[in-house]
């Protein structure tokens, strides 16, 4: 039996208030499949989707999903389903889902899939319980199929951060994992700032003493380097040679 979603009150955020800003260089670019006229536009849309979901500016080969890209390029699936497939991919699970707590997964999912931050701690708690009961796959389907996603992005637009005009972009303040996972990795990596690491390393070094072999100089044969014979060819040096003077 699925636990019903806990109720929470939305807070006032920029995307919930009508805005009349003049578009500028800070305005996010909207990548839509309806505006794609050639393959280069499709490639830019795919790159924007990877950047939005994985929050990485460089798309790694291990991150890419060729089958999803092929289906999107052939218009066999919508952008909504492409975003869904990226968020439910095994790569995303390994890099993001397995390295974060449920509370932070809620924050990451809302920012990358709905383009907004959590309203409050009550919303984080409510969705974290949903992840614990239904799993990550079902949680992604709930967000992507929600009315909020449909009203803001529809089927053919890549999600983006809605109405950002002051704060830094989400992809700059929401790294792949937080201090929770970083502290967990502290036990398995070298920490250069701890003096105890140097002491333990020094104690673990095994020094093999050098065995010096005594040598007697009584029987050392020194070769004779004195010249006993005169050269047969006389030296061709003329002491009366003169040199031009300026």
UniProtKB/Swiss-Prot annotation:
Residue ranges occupied by any PBS-linker domain in the UniProt entry: 11-189
Membrane topology, as annotated: Peripheral membrane protein
Localization: Cellular thylakoid membrane
Entries under Pfam families matching the protein: PBS_linker_poly
GO biological process, any: photosynthesis
Major place of residence: membrane
KW 4Fe-4S (keyword) present: no
Region (Disordered): 224-246
Keywords, comma-separated and alphabetical: Antenna complex, Membrane, Photosynthesis, Phycobilisome, Thylakoid
UniProt family annotation: Belongs to the phycobilisome linker protein family.
Function of the protein: Rod-core linker protein required for attachment of phycocyanin to allophycocyanin in cores of phycobilisomes. Linker polypeptides determine the state of aggregation and the location of the disk-shaped phycobiliprotein units within the phycobilisome and modulate their spectroscopic properties in order to mediate a directed and optimal energy transfer.
Oligomer status and interactors: The phycobilisome is a hemidiscoidal structure that is composed of two distinct substructures: a core complex and a number of rods radiating from the core.
Protein's name according to its UniProt entry: Phycobilisome rod-core linker polypeptide CpcG2
Organism lineage: Bacteria, Bacillati, Cyanobacteriota, Cyanophyceae, Acaryochloridales
Name of the gene: cpcG2
């Amino acid at each position: 039996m699925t636990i019903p979603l806990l109720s929470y009150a939305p807070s006032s955020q920029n995307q919930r208030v009508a805005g009349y800003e003049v578009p500028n260089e800070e305005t996010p670019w909207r990548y839509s499949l309806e505006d794609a006229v050639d393959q280069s536009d499709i490639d830019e849309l795919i790159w924007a989707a990877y950047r939005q979901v994985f929050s990485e500016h460089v798309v790694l080969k291990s991150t890419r999903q060729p089958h999803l890209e092929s289906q999107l390029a052939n218009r066999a699936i919508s952008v909504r389903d492409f975003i869904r497939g990226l968020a439910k991919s095994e790569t995303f699970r390994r890099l993001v889902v397995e390295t974060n707590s449920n509370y932070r997964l809620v924050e990451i999912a809302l920012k990358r899939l709905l383009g907004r931050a959590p309203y409050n701690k009550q919303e984080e708690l409510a969705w974290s319980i949903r992840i614990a009961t239904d799993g990550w796959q079902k949680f992604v389907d709930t967000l992507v199929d929600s009315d909020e996603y449909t009203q803001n992005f529809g089927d053919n637009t890549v999600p983006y951060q809605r109405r950002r005009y002051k704060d830094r972009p989400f992809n700059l303040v929401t790294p792949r994992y937080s201090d929770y996972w970083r502290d967990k990795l502290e036990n398995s990596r070298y920490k250069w700032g701890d003096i105890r690491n140097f002491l333990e390393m020094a104690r673990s070094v095994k020094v093999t003493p050098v065995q010096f072999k005594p040598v007697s100089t009584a029987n050392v044969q020194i070769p004779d380097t004195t010249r006993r014979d005169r050269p047969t060819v006389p030296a061709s040096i003329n002491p009366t040679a003169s040199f031009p003077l300026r």
